[in-house]
């Protein structure tokens, strides 16, 4: 499998990690769209949100959200932040390994674009 994020998990590609545990890694986005912009990804390869299993991945999905919230607060986003997940081409997904973008420390607008 030639998955960019799996290669980051394996340590084959460097990333500026801000957090890691046995289930997830969080690292700064290479093209930040806000003063704070990091990704939270599972170590387990799951290509899209359609591939999540309620039976097997419910705890992992919850852990990703809690990790995003905790790290956003640690990075000074107490006034608010945005969490974005894209799914498939029409949803804007470009890396087929689920991931959350967490953006903060600036005013967010709607619609996003």
Residues of each region from the PLM?
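HIT superfamily nucleotide-processing domains
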Residues: 1-113
């Amino acid at each position: 499998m030639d998955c960019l994020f799996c290669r980051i998990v394996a340590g084959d590609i460097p990333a500026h990690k801000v957090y890691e545990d046995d289930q997830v890694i969080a690292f700064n986005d290479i093209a930040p769209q806000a003063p704070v912009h990091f990704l939270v990804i599972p170590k387990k390869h799951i290509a899209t949100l359609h591939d999540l299993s309620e039976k097997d991945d419910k705890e992992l999905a919850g852990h990703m959200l809690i990790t995003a919230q905790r790290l956003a607060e640690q990075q000074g986003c107490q006034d608010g932040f945005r969490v974005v997940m894209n799914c498939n081409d029409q949803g804007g997904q470009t890396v087929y390994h689920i991931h959350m973008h967490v953006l903060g420390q600036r005013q967010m607008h709607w619609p996003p674009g």
